Amino acid sequence: MPDGFSRTIETLAATTQNVCVNTENERSWLPNSGFQLRKAGVWFDAVRVDGAEGRRLADMMDSITAGDPGPIVTESNGARAVYFYLPAGSTAHRVWAPGVTRFNSGSGRVSYVPVPALSGETWPLFWYCPPVDSGRFVHPAILRNAAAALFGHPMSF
């Protein structure tokens, strides 16, 4: 009989459809070269998980979604953060596991997220999983549940 973690992964794998959002200007949120800061809540929200836990979560999302988790960026210096790009408006008003930092725009709040170009010199940021479609992002429920399973923090919906 599978353990609770395996059941969670199986349940999450059954709901891997990415969420579509504003596709008005195709990939205009992606810089042509280097990297730029983008205001969260306009094209996307983001969550960040630092260090080895972030990389484990990215690996988990890659596995759960059969290699199509949505856009994920890794940072190779400092806190070695991993950024998960989600549909705009999807991170606010939800409980996230400890260790997850949300980037969105709410009342009285402005957040900026680094976004690398798809090619060329983008150090210290690199695409773990580049965007494959302008309107596809990481699925919020799958990511929240995967983070909860990784950090051992039960979620209530």
Language model feature labels by segment:
Residues 1-78, 87-91, 106-113, 118-157:
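Signature for HUH/AEP ssDNA processing cores
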Residues 90-104:
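Histidine-dependent nucleotide/RNA phosphoesterase domain, centered on the 2H-phosphoesterase fold
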Residues 81:
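Histidine-centered, metal-coordinating catalytic motifs and their short helical/loop contexts
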